[in-house]
Amino acid sequence: MTFRAQMLDTLTSQSSRDLEAQALGLVPIVVETSGRGERSYDIYSRLLKERIVFLVGEVNDQTANLVVAQMLFLESENPDKDISFYINSPGGSVSAGMAIYDTMQFIKPDVSTLCMGLAASMGAFLLAAGAKGKRFALPNSRVMIHQPLGGARGQASDIEIQAREILYLKERLNHLLAHHTGQPVERIARDTDRDNFMSGDDAQAYGLVDQVAHKRP
């Protein structure tokens, strides 16, 4: 078995397990027939062959590792061909989301992002982090930005350490979001003070996406 086949088998198996758990086991299987016989894929792994990566559900270490692995694999396959990153996520862990973000900026292929359903919190941040001119939202999708959430427990000194960290993350995320949207940092800070929901058109006007996609071009 070639390295490519081994890598695809590994990603297929892992993505199948993760996405089946998210969808309560209701993941369609695609069967392809060739001269060498039949081969089955879960639908997400089949779409991976078309360079489509999904972020579905919460952003956590498990989903981030899966997304990062798929992006690195697709870069190794063809560093000059775009990757399509479809997002339907309420957000989640900042550190897990930053692992995806840094990978998007690190790899050679442009990453085109598309919001379907909801891109909230870290999901919205990753949506905005796509390649300029290649960030899309579907007409009835929703986008929500806000400041990072956190809860501090323990001794007073521990709470102080955690408070400094979340304030650092808030400032860092605000500056990165300002970079990707073209908005002043001061406006980002003001607009993310509370949950801020937007339509696709609002997200386009704000600079989170470049276009509301009604039909495939």
Swiss-Prot record:
Protein purpose: Cleaves peptides in various proteins in a process that requires ATP hydrolysis. Has a chymotrypsin-like activity. Plays a major role in the degradation of misfolded proteins.
PANTHER family, sorted: ATP-DEPENDENT CLP PROTEASE PROTEOLYTIC SUBUNIT (PTHR10381:SF70)
Alphabetized NCBIfam families for the sequence: clpP, PRK00277.1, PRK12553.1
Catalytic residue list: 121 (nucleophile), 146
EC number of the protein: 3.4.21.92
Name of the protein: ATP-dependent Clp protease proteolytic subunit 2
Family: Belongs to the peptidase S14 family.
Gene Ontology MF terms: ATP-dependent peptidase activity; ATPase binding; serine-type endopeptidase activity
Cellular component per GO, a single term: cytoplasm
Keyword NAD: no
